């Protein structure tokens, strides 16, 4: 029997395919393609819309996976899927798409109600009996996360309030939709992805039925809940032909990209804090039983347990904001359009020439606020004539990001999680940035080990497929066997 497993990661920027080999604990091959399926008009982008063609996105993911399988000659035993955990796609009874896919970036629930000062999200929060400490985002009891516009339930609430919710439809998210197309069955959802709907009862691991009713939403809009690491069904003949693999290949239920990234990165759940910096950023640790979450999120983990995670305050987009400022300034002042990707490398190099501590410059990096402080603003402080430089601003920002991520870990300890002895990093925001790596080591006060496998979320999804296929008894066992130990090239922490 083949020890290869294929996984698809349906991201908003790229779609990724990966094949792993359990015999060698290696990635056989990976392929990515830009996600070109967005259909949002320029006008709608200006008002916070984010609409996509999910059928086109699925075709793109299948084509990308087929090219990888052809190039590697891999013959997978099963297929796993992961991807963005929020958003909404409506389906009719025949499983055809109805309207566009609203991504997690779509902010229509933040629109003000006609003739009123408060938003649809405010109305939803009030109707569902949410609670919020002054200055914090509202949250429904036991849902593990604050109420945010990109979740599926707020999209449904907005559609219903505007009489745009057709009868006899149901909802799904992108990863579940892809699985549905692969197996030709109605979408189902596991607990890790159900959290992204915003109305999932985390301690009970069930839909919050009373809350859903209070919001005036019909239960039929929500997919059936199933366990992680189980099979959604066999691959259809049509999809098998597109992929170039045998029909009937087992396809696993999709799981959330954050949880899959943890599974693909962390070998020792009990003793590790995992930091991921991609477009967003998270610091997370595994716990067996629910704890009060404070300002963090309590996310169901794959099969059992939970991740206590600091989510969304800082990430790759934080550094991108500073990069874009310099790029726009260069263009405005010199009438030159700089290479924005090369500008990242140059800013990191300049930051590396600045002493640790940025000679007193401090940055509050919350350009978009945070879950606990949604109205917070970014700031640079303690600047002098000598330190108002690109290098000082960059180092201060990266060190400020490390503080925010480490504060999540310190909050988890305060809530009762216990300390961890290992720090593992994932995501290109960490792998390509030695200044940030060193800042994280300093803030967490432990060495940072960078995962040896790229595309960690896809690796985790492949491991989910392997568990569903019987290659491992649990996802924890799969992670312990496959996920990164000490990297082949250790993270350098000798930045000046």
Predicted regions and their residues:
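Short, acidic/turn-prone active-site loops that include or flank metal/cofactor-
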Residues: 32-33, 38, 102-109, 279-281, ...
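Active-site phosphate-binding/coordination module
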Residues: 54, 66-153
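Short, glycine/acidic-enriched loop or turn micro-motifs at the edges of active sites
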Residues: 12, 24, 109, 256, ...
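N-terminal glycine/serine-rich phosphate-binding loop of ATP-dependent small-molecule kinases
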Residues: 1-100, 167, 223-224, 240-241, ...
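Short beta-strand to alpha-helix junction loop
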Residues: 203, 228-232
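Nucleotide/phosphate-binding loop and acidic/charged catalytic motifs
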Residues: 188-194
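Active-site core segments that coordinate phosphate-bearing ligands/cofactors
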Residues: 6-7, 118-143, 150-187, 198-209, ...
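Short acidic-aromatic active-site loops that bind/stabilize oxyanions
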Residues: 47-58, 145-149, 225-229, 253, ...
